[in-house]
């Protein structure tokens, strides 16, 4: 028995007849609040993503968070076949198997739910896939998104073991290779969200360049600077064609702020971000009691 994904429906390949159980969904409310999109990464080993649905705007009652990203599934390589694939730990697998309980309630409020893809201590990474491997992995990501009813993918190029002498199917790490992966994802997921988390001073963990006439700034929906509690303006210029409206220069860990562990949460900084034309504010790991 094998499963295939077709337009978001999982079917068994050995069946001769299919019975589809259709569950009607209510219209998704409009959660748009302004020009700044809010994104929250949730480390699901520690926190419940449903916490994000409890944060609402005081006056309108709309959800505070526009996008919630499950952190994280992994990119890994099969040691026998050499094929790159998605790996989920027990916590992520539990969420996906119980999507009606954990994911759909957020989506019903108008919140987009993405999956973060993170390196996992082997050679598989965003910056070293060959053309064929990038296209193949993009198709697997699409099937994954369709089967579990997700709204997009966020990429975080950490923890990959890049090699000076790449194995078959891999190339030397480059920002252009990373851009090619995003291009392949955009081809098969034209209507899904694609985001990038970056933080290194040399920018090697982020894509840049142009593929088939499209710059990385055109291919992604947003990128964010992931060094928490630091506000750095101007980094967007290091990503080909990326406008300020798609960049988040300031990420905040909500729990530390709530406990008084940081002093950098300032209203004037958030206001300056908006006034400067940036279009993304990033948060991490909200607690339920706020």
Please provide the spans of the model-predicted regions:
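Secreted glycan hydrolases and related glycan-binding modules that recognize and/or cleave
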Residues: 1-290
């Amino acid at each position: 028995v094998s499963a295939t994904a077709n337009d978001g429906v999982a079917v068994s390949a050995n069946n001769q007849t299919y019975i589809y159980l259709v569950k009607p969904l209510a219209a998704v409310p409009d959660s748009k609040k302004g020009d700044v999109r809010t994104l929250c990464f949730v480390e699901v080993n520690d926190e419940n993503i449903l916490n994000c649905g409890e944060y609402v705007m005081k006056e309108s009652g709309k959800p505070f968070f526009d996008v919630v990203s499950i952190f994280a599934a992994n990119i890994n390589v099969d040691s026998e076949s050499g094929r790159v694939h998605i790996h989920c730990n027990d916590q992520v697998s539990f969420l996906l198997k119980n999507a009606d309980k954990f994911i759909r309630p957020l989506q019903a409020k108008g919140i987009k739910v993405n999956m973060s893809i993170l390196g996992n201590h082997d050679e598989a990474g965003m910056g070293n896939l060959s053309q064929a491997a990038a296209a193949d992995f993009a198709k697997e990501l699409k099937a994954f998104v369709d089967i579990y009813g997700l709204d997009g993918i966020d990429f975080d190029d950490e923890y990959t073991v890049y090699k000076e002498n790449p194995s078959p199917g891999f190339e030397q790490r480059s920002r252009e290779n990373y851009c090619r992966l995003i291009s392949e994802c955009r081809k098969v997921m034209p209507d899904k969200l694609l985001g990038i988390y970056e933080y290194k001073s040399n920018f090697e963990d982020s894509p840049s360049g142009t593929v088939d006439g499209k710059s990385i700034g055109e291919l992604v929906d947003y990128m964010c600077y992931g060094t928490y509690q630091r506000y750095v303006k101007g980094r967007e210029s290091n990503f080909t064609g990326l406008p300020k409206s798609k960049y988040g220069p300031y990420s905040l860990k909500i729990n530390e702020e709530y406990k008084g562990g940081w002093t950098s949460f300032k209203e004037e900084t958030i206001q300056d971000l908006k006034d400067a034309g940036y279009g993304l504010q990033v948060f991490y790991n909200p607690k339920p009691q706020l």
